[in-house]
UniProtKB/Swiss-Prot annotation:
Belongs to the CRISPR-associated Csm5 family. NCBIfam families: cas_TM1807_csm5. CRISPR (clustered regularly interspaced short palindromic repeat) is an adaptive immune system that provides protection against mobile genetic elements (viruses, transposable elements and conjugative plasmids). CRISPR clusters contain spacers, sequences complementary to antecedent mobile elements, and target invading nucleic acids. CRISPR clusters are transcribed and processed into CRISPR RNA (crRNA). The gene is csm5. The keyword RNA-binding applies. GO terms for molecular function: RNA binding. Disruption phenotype: Deletion of the entire CRISPR-Cas locus (cas6 to cas2, Rv2824c to Rv2816c) decreases resistance to plasmids encoding spacer elements about 6-fold. This is CRISPR system Cms protein Csm5. Pfam families: RAMPs (PF03787). The keyword RNA-binding applies. GO terms for cellular component: cytosol; plasma membrane. Keywords: Antiviral defense, RNA-binding. Part of the Csm effector complex that includes Cas10, Csm2, Csm3, Csm4 and Csm5. It comes from Mycobacterium tuberculosis (strain ATCC 25618 / H37Rv). PANTHER family: CRISPR SYSTEM CMS PROTEIN CSM5.
Amino acid sequence: MNTYLKPFELTLRCLGPVFIGSGEKRTSKEYHVEGDRVYFPDMELLYADIPAHKRKSFEAFVMNTDGAQATAPLKEWVEPNAVKLDPAKHRGYEVKIGSIEPRRASRGRGGRMTRKKLTLNEIHAFIKDPLGRPYVPGSTVKGMLRSIYLQSLVHKRTAQPVRVPGHQTREHRQYGERFERKELRKSGRPNTRPQDAVNDLFQAIRVTDSPALRTSDLLICQKMDMNVHGKPDGLPLFRECLAPGTSISHRVVVDTSPTARGGWREGERFLETLAETAASVNQARYAEYRAMYPGVNAIVGPIVYLGGGAGYRSKTFVTDQDDMAKVLDAQFGKVVKHVDKTRELRVSPLVLKRTKIDNICYEMGQCELSIRRAE
């Protein structure tokens, strides 16, 4: 191998469920629930198995997205039409369902406090390869590494909270883009402008996709918010996630040639000390925040957050709580006034992103990182 290229082996062990979405949603007409498991048949094979004279009826059932029929489960058509779901014929795969938490208590008729029970609806699918096997894209992990690097710079340079001028989403984005350009667009390649993406130091880092995982590594997880009073709120959003305990591996290669040739000499040191850097970011960014939530134990060490549903704090380098609240108000202010609540509770974001599996709470996206030099 070229002596400029330094390979590493990165491993992420899921402590909580990890969601990397494919952009697809599976409706209740595309799966069958049996106890605590969901069976996703191959819909093409299922359709081919339906007698020809019943196919128009099935098509009408699947395509009907109005009224009560919009959320009708698959069994409402297959059972009365004597079509037996058979994994041997219809292939597909089966996934366990995590615990489903009711909505937070609200006042109902007669002034009584009640919690609305929820059932599965649309399920956001995990990304899969052409053979239907889940995997984690290298681009997702590279984005996580980029966030860790920028967050570590922020926490090393100042003990004061990082402020963002203005409070609109656009202003926050522009400030973030300027910060990234200043810290990362340093290659200075010939015949380019300083702000060009080709001058980004992270161009020198390549991350492979993970090896294919198994569908048995997946779990259906509900989005659940927990406030600082320890009260959970189950939301009607469900995702296919990698289950806690799953290990994900990636090969990471850094080009240490001169920056003008697209390399990043200091990138080798960044990867060598990545576990220590992740641990310091975890301590600076999450320790005090997580301590605000009752029953949430502090976890020290190289803890990182990967994928969707992990919360705003994992996606930004801003540390000032009031500024976080302003940005969140700009995005979601019609629902909750984050600024007012942050001043009252002294925490932002206002909820911890969690889910339940067998009635045990987990944080979304939480992983333990390890890295070593590779051959």
